[in-house]
Amino acid sequence: MGLALLCRPSQESKFDLDENQVRPYLKLENVRDGVFYVANKLYGITFTQLDNLPLPHPDAQAFECKDKDGSHLGVLYMDFFPRASKKGGAWCGSYRSQTYKDGKKVAPVVTVVCNFTKPAAGQPALLSADEANTLFHDSDTLYIIFSKMYIIMVWLVFRVIL
């Protein structure tokens, strides 16, 4: 954020950019769909909203991610708005990493979590340019979905006896 604040005056003077004038063009659903569009154009994957899965909150969304051949790659949860039980900031994570059980792939379940300002009832959520950038950045959680590797993490604890 520090760099963004330092760059803001030069961006405003160089590009005559006013965050409040950009906001109406960055409707949350359109930016989310833009992330999906870029992922489709780059990797051929598609996203379909799932309405039959439990959600961490009624405002959250779930999407099935399919490879270009139509095979299931994983599930992506997106949770955009703040609430009392949620920490601040934005991040990506994994509810379940890809694994194999009895020789069969168990697909990952990943999440993108943000704390964008929740709109008033009936109004669209409008993002700042910085928030749109955050959504694209934290959507890098897709690397977990793309992974074809099975990784076993081993934690070693060394004790030093003095």
Predicted regions and their residues:
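Acidic/histidine-rich catalytic neighborhood
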Residues: 72, 148-162
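Active-site recognition of the HExxH zinc-binding catalytic motif
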Residues: 39, 118, 123-149
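Alpha-helix N-cap/helix-initiation motif
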Residues: 24, 28, 124-132, 158
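Short, exposed beta-strand "edge-strand" segments with a Pro/Gly-rich flavor and a Y/T-containing core
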Residues: 14-16, 121-125, 156
